[in-house]
């Protein structure tokens, strides 16, 4: 019998902290005129501080929409650059590549969430733990090596093209009856559309790290920090079919 499957996101889940996002934004700002660069970086900082609520202080309605609609800080930087400052796609992509390269350097502050990693180590006795990230494999694997967590997962799927890439992965791993037996899956992450929706839509357990209290859609449990969701992950791994009890363990509302 195939083991239950725990899908784990990387940015904002396994690792936390805004230093890499600030580096990404700074590299994009290098391509802007000085005044525009200052405005762009200021808008980025507002999002990092207040999330979608930062739209209230936006300079114009386009910026407000970009901030309000961004599902995470990486998306906010991308949306600001593309929608508000017309930064070309190749420039944005190069800035992201430089950011990922910088994260491999020990000098770059990358905050590994230790309690989560300890929990994953325990859960691997009962479930398959798979890291699924949209970041390219050629930069992700060296970063995992730097952090010493390459062996912490049963499988690593980089360049996953979530959310649809995650949906395809679930079909391959769980088979055609994934909707009939959704209890075999739990997904944890901080990007609702990429990490949570593909699980929630088939009735599987979904643990949403909702940093800014967005409440984007249904989830088994949500909390602002992944540490507050660890009891949910442990309970699911211990009794995957008992997912109806999981929301109470997070101390947050479940579906809704």
Region annotations inferred by a language model:
Residues 1-3, 117-121, 130, 135-256:
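Asp-based, Mg2+/Mn2+-dependent phosphohydrolase catalytic module
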Residues 20, 112, 162-166:
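Phosphate/oxyanion-binding active-site loops and adjacent basic polyanion-contact surfaces
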Residues 21-29, 41, 74-79, 137, ...:
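An amphipathic alpha-helix signature
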Residues 45-103, 121:
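A metal-dependent, Asp-based hydrolase signature
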């Amino acid at each position: 019998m195939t083991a239950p499957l725990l899908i784990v996101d990387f940015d904002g889940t396994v690792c936390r902290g805004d230093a890499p996002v600030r580096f990404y934004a700074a590299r994009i700002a290098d391509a802007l005129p000085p005044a525009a660069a200052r405005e762009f970086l200021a808008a980025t900082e507002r999002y990092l501080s207040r999330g979608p609520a930062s739209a209230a202080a936006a300079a114009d309605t386009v910026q407000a929409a970009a901030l309000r609609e961004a599902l995470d800080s990486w998306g906010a930087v991308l949306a600001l650059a593309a929608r508000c400052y017309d930064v070309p796609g190749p420039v944005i992509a190069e800035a992201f590549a430089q950011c990922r390269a910088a994260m491999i350097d020990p000098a770059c502050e990358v905050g590994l969430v230790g309690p989560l990693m300890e929990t994953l180590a325990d859960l691997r006795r009962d479930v398959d733990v798979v890291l699924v990230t949209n970041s390219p494999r050629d930069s992700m694997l060296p970063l995992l090596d730097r952090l010493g967590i390459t062996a912490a997962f049963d499988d690593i799927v980089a360049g996953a093209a979530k959310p649809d890439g995650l949906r395809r992965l679930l079909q391959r791993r769980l088979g055609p009856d994934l909707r009939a037996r959704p209890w075999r899956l739990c997904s944890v992450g901080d990007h609702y559309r990429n990490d949570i929706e593909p699980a929630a839509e088939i009735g599987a357990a979904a643990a949403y790290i909702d940093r800014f209290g967005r409440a984007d859609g249904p989830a088994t449990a949500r909390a602002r920090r992944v540490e507050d969701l660890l009891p949910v992950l442990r309970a699911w791994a211990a009794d995957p079919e008992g997912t109806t009890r999981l929301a109470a363990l997070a101390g947050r509302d479940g579906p809704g």
